[in-house]
Amino acid sequence: MNHLEGSAEVEVADEAPGGEVNESVEADLEHPEVVEGQQPSPSPPPPAGHEPEDHRGHPAPPPPPPPQEEEEEERGECLARSASTESGFHNHTDTAEGDVLAAARDGYEAERAQDADDESAYAVQYRPEAEEYTEQAEAEHVEAAQRRALPNHLHFHSLEHEEAMNAAYSGYVYTHRLFHRAEDEPYAEPYADYGGLQEHVYEEIGDAPELEARDGLRLYERERDEAAAYRQEALGARLHHYDERSDGESDSPEKEAEFAPYPRMDSYEQEEDIDQIVAEVKQSMSSQSLDKAAEDMPEAEQDLERAPTPGGGHPDSPGLPAPAGQQQRVVGTPGGSEVGQRYSKEKRDAISLAIKDIKEAIEEVKTRTIRSPYTPDEPKEPIWVMRQDISPTRDCDDQRPVDGDSPSPGSSSPLGAESSSIPLHPGDPTEASTNKESRKSLASFPTYVEVPGPCDPEDLIDGIIFAANYLGSTQLLSDKTPSKNVRMMQAQEAVSRIKTAQKLAKSRKKAPEGESQPMTEVDLFISTQRIKVLNADTQEPMMDHPLRTISYIADIGNIVVLMARRRMPRSNSQENVEASHPSQDGKRQYKMICHVFESEDAQLIAQSIGQAFSVAYQEFLRANGINPEDLSQKEYSDLLNTQDMYNDDLIHFSKSENCKDVFIEKQKGEILGVVIVESGWGSILPTVIIANMMHGGPAEKSGKLNIGDQIMSINGTSLVGLPLSTCQSIIKGLKNQSRVKLNIVRCPPVTTVLIRRPDLRYQLGFSVQNGIICSLMRGGIAERGGVRVGHRIIEINGQSVVATPHEKIVHILSNAVGEIHMKTMPAAMYRLLTAQEQPVYI
């Protein structure tokens, strides 16, 4: 909406049907003299030989005698007025809210070329789903043009027809219609009455019988009430829609949270929003004035109905008038004329007041910056809401850090880090009060639970900056969940690739075109939302990764490796293979983007990123109404300090009678005849266990070894902490010896576990898959209780779970509280003892 006075032709874009208010009001701004003084043009004479009919199609009685020519002239003017008005109401389309609708002007074609740029900037495309409705409107426009050829006929516009037209557009909020005047139609006041835009037009031609006029009046009153209710409902819906989208947002933290993920618009989009707000203000204020006029209208009409008729009030009196057009006229009734003039004056006063308010609102919009309801201001203080991931290209301007912002004296951020938090409007008290109210409405949780790390949690919310040198980036293919050792190997490979590329670049006099020079100075921006790499000089974002895509961070000396995950696109053949083999889902390859930096604060950078994950997790808990203290690490550590290590293994190993040196005699070239398995990660002394012995072999014939015995050393060589393959190689090397010395600890094949879990809030600290313990949390209550990775659970609290389904085992463990007694066995030993695997003796 760049100007109020503009075109003569109605610009039909996709505007809400509330737009007719804009058109009518702007028409008044341009032609105030039309509303007050212009008279409608006389109607064209009826065709020769055509007899006028009443509204039911019966021939009308002959015209009155010549002395009543003035009355007929007045009725002719009224008929022309109603005919033009009715044809106008049959020509309407819907346009979208916020477009410009201007009144008529003869020089429109000359101005159209000058305003081409404005039209291209502010034009709104048609709604694709409204095509069916537009076609119906055009068809009705043709029908109305045909009906104008018979000005002496009465054309009924029923509510059922309107509802049928709205069937294809029923999903939209607004239901008002626009007046669209044909280009060749002479100007006649289309909005003589702003209070009844959808009332029906009836005209009495000649002296109709009193009974028919009375029936027409009753029909008019009934349909007028229905149209008024329909209009008020639609108008109320539009006002309610406007209030929901604008007025209620700045006062409600829930609304702020709802619109928080939207990115900030550039200047072009802000201009569009200002124009849209102006349109909404005009519609709202004009509609209020029209609503008031609609409320006052029934009183005036009641006065007209109670006015004395020339026949003395008899119902069959031939002088009973029928309503003419949108404005009631009583022929030959002075009292009725005065009432109509008074009502018309009140109407003009209400419209003038609305125009004045609109002008003031427009001036206020021009002189004051208005925040669009779709781009709420960023808060100066963090508001605890769950945030959605936004595209890096859309919101990089929102979180772009500013140089020179050092951390506050009381901040616990590291010396190498700078805080990037600055208020958008430092002197705006409204924003500060809104933020305070938002914080009061949140759960009364502590601000932060202590999170280990070098930074203050509040600084991580706003973002901190580290200075670094960008060395380069490379891509690696990785599994979905590789181990830490694999991650470190990938990080080292990325560093070696970058250093090799640097050496090649140094060997050349000039780097190839399109390849960045090494050692670019950058600012590494770290927050709970994302990690950005900014050019130190221009502050332009070079890389931007949401925090949730960061899979690994490693510091190797003064080198920092940042690894971000990206899904590798798959070909059709790969998709077909995975569709036929769902088990291959975990084997998908992922692209890992590895960025390599050099910084003196490499360790601080890695620790800060790890701390950002912890603070982001607390944000998630608070947004879901969970007190972070309920799951704090401190409380869990206090629980561990109250528990003693389950020391049955330690006591067993410390007893001298359980530790023995065993000598095995055998023939040279003969194998020892044993099967060994790992004791399992989490045991007191990680070593190998005898899982099976060959029948008739040297180990079995000696009678000194049992299944479950742990081998500490062989011929003075310790096996503690060695990989299983190494231990197997050592035993295989005994083939040429005739005497073997083994140091063993006698242990039962089944291990006893005791877990103390005081409450369901505390996790057990291990995971189970098909009855086998596959992972264990270091330092948790499960490790203290003697749980070992690679063991199969045999028994839980005295109940055997050997043949129990996996889901039931998980259910039992999840609901177990107090002391949990379990018996486990190495899974490989279990398979050998149950003949699920064939032993391979060494």
Curated annotation (Swiss-Prot):
Start-end of Basic and acidic residues biased regions: 106-115, 240-258, 392-403
GO biological process annotation, one example: locomotory behavior
Stretches for region Disordered: 1-121, 238-349, 366-439
Low complexity: bias regions: 404-421
Residue(s) carrying Phosphoserine: S82, S246, S250, S252, S267, S284, S289, S317, S372, S406, S408, S413, S573
CDD domains reported for this sequence: Mint1_CID, PDZ1_APBA1_3-like, PDZ2_APBA1_3-like, PTB_X11
Keyword Glycoprotein on entry: no
Key words, A-Z: Cytoplasm, Golgi apparatus, Nucleus, Phosphoprotein, Protein transport, Repeat, Transport
Tissue specificity comment: Isoform 3 is expressed in brain.
Domain PID: 460-648
Known partners and oligomeric status: Part of a multimeric complex containing STXBP1 and STX1A. Interacts with STXBP1. Component of the brain-specific heterotrimeric complex (LIN-10-LIN-2-LIN-7 complex) composed of at least APBA1, CASK, and LIN7, which associates with the motor protein KIF17 to transport vesicles along microtubules. Within the complex, interacts (via PDZ domain) with the motor protein KIF17; the interaction is direct and is required for association of KIF17 with the cargo that is to be transported. Binds to the cytoplasmic domain of amyloid protein (APP). Interacts (via PDZ 1 and 2 domains) with FSPB.
Name listed for the protein in its UniProt record: Amyloid-beta A4 precursor protein-binding family A member 1
Name of the coding gene: Apba1
